[in-house]
Structures are given as structure tokens and as C-alpha cells.
From Swiss-Prot:
The gene is cyp141. Its cofactor is heme. This is Putative cytochrome P450 141. GO terms for cellular component: plasma membrane. It is found in: Cell membrane. Belongs to the cytochrome P450 family. Its EC number is 1.14.-.-. It comes from the Bacteria. The keyword Heme applies.
Amino acid sequence: MTSTSIPTFPFDRPVPTEPSPMLSELRNSCPVAPIELPSGHTAWLVTRFDDVKGVLSDKRFSCRAAAHPSSPPFVPFVQLCPSLLSIDGPQHTAARRLLAQGLNPGFIARMRPVVQQIVDNALDDLAAAEPPVDFQEIVSVPIGEQLMAKLLGVEPKTVHELAAHVDAAMSVCEIGDEEVSRRWSALCTMVIDILHRKLAEPGDDLLSTIAQANRQQSTMTDEQVVGMLLTVVIGGVDTPIAVITNGLASLLHHRDQYERLVEDPGRVARAVEEIVRFNPATEIEHLRVVTEDVVIAGTALSAGSPAFTSITSANRDSDQFLDPDEFDVERNPNEHIAFGYGPHACPASAYSRMCLTTFFTSLTQRFPQLQLARPFEDLERRGKGLHSVGIKELLVTWPT
């Protein structure tokens, strides 16, 4: 990057499962850099590990301010709803506390056999298929949608419809404002209807717990609860699909790493940490706005400036990780921030780790000879946007 050029986001990503080379370039030469958004606005991007952690824990970088109409319209969803992506302070604390009541250790323990059954069913479908097959279509997508369905206590077809609307509401540049508004209206109507049903007929699921707890405590409005639950859907459908698919692609590309897990299932938990470090779900995080003048890594950001962090880039920082571009399922230590950092860190990290460990343990034991059916170099990126790290398909094969 020259001293006068400003890179445009979304960045080119020649290898779909690898971060854009632009992130490495910025991290090494301009760790706090201006970037151009699809809207034409300019924002700051922070790319080094320590700086990213600093921003994520700094109250002067506000998610709430990013939801103001004067902020760049990066992701329409953020400005449409008071979600976990667009609130700070006591309001955010109340929302997290309510969500934590649903994602408590007891609930996660009760979900473990449910998750195992979902994984087993998906792998049964894989075993019944004639290779080569698209692993994403047969395994990753059904698992992602069924996990969310069980978590929320709804049917998989409902999750599929919710996810379709969320994709539009989270669009960076693919659709127009009118379509975003239409999808958003449908999305809110669906979630409010589900919440009312859960209040009338509660079950042992996240939605029921949240709906009942909020009725008793009255800490949030219906609109705020809807926003919080939509945040869960955003992170709970596309993210596991991308992490499972891209994680497997990395394992099969580095076949010796896959074989280590086949040989010793006890290595899977540590491997999951490397998979999420190496294969993050997003290239940059949601927008924040600086509320007062601040200096990051020698660069002055004035109050009102829009700013992003890149956990993807931070997790490849050579000042934090030895050989950060090497995929090593036994990496230790591995103090990544794949699940975020600070007040807005992922509230479902323990649940996500359990799901991923269950999945990769079962997969490597049932399909020890799984292989890529197409060269790794031929993988294609699914599309551009904030959630742009997915691949179109992952063809796999195995001896029959």
C-alpha cells in the first residue's frame, strides 16, 4: 500500500480460507489505517493484537454511537435495532446478564447429548452419500441450522427463514435499502411471534428462558429483546457453518494435522482453539465510533471517527504468536481472541467450544480417511460482505 492509497473493503481474498493479504500488509506497515467502505465513507481499521484488544476494551470506542443515523451505513442491521452490536454500558450489561441466564453451565450440559445426536445424524447422512459430496451442504449447513433450532426451541425451517432474512439485514453492499427494510420487517415479525409463543408455552430452550426472565425482571423492552435474539441468530448460524467448513478445509489441507486428531481424540479440544484462531468467522468486526480524541499506535483518531478492529488480523500477529501463519493443532500457548475481548466478547463461547469439540471428535473417529476431492487451491469464496469468509462448497471423498 502506498502512502496515498486507501484500500477498499471488502478486501480481495485469493485463498478463501485465508485472511486477505491486505490485512498482513496493513498490520506490518500501517497498523491503524484508513479504509474505504462500500458506502464511500472512510473509517479506521486497527490490525495489531495489542491494539485490537485495547480498542475492544476501551469505552471511548462506542457501539451505541455507531448506531446513530450520522454514522456510516456499514451494516444496516446495526442502525435498525438496539442489539448487542449497537448498545453499550448498563443497557449492554443488562442484555448480557439476561442472555447469560439462558446460556448457563447447566443448560450447556443438558445440550451436550442433543448436540451429539445432531452431529451423529449429520454424519450418518454423510456416510450414506456417494462420494465425492459437498460437505458443507450435507453436514455443515444442517448442523448449523439444527443447533440453532434446538438452542432457540424452534423448527429448523424457522431458523432457515430467519437466517435468510439475517443475511440481508447484515448485507454490506449486495442489496438496496428498500429490500433491507422489507427483510427487517419480516424478521422482527417472526421473532416477536416466537417470543409470544414461548411466553405462552415455555420449554427448556434459550428463548423460553430469556422471555420468562425478562417478564419477571422487566429489564428490557420487547424491541431490545428482539435485537438481542437476532444477534444470537447472526452469530449462531453462519458462524458455525463457516468455522466447521473452513476448519475442515484447513485440516484436510494439512493432512498430518487431521491424522493427529484421528490418532488421539484427546487433542481435539486444543485443535478447536487453533481452528477458531486460524479460521475466524469474519474479516473485521462491527463498527464503533470514537467518542473523544484518542491515539492508537501513534495515530490520532478524532472524536466522531468510525473505527473497526480485525480479530482475524490480530490472531495472525507475529508479536503474539510464533509462526502465526502455520496451522498447528497442538499450538501451546494459544491465547487468541477469536471469541472477542472486553464487554462485547462472545457470550456463547463455552457453548461454541462444546459444539465444535463434539463435532470434530466425532468426525475424525468416524471418517479417519476423509480427503479433499478437489485441490485446496480451487476452493471458491462464497461472496463478499462482513460475513465473507465462507466458501461455496467443500467437496470431500473417502474410501468406500
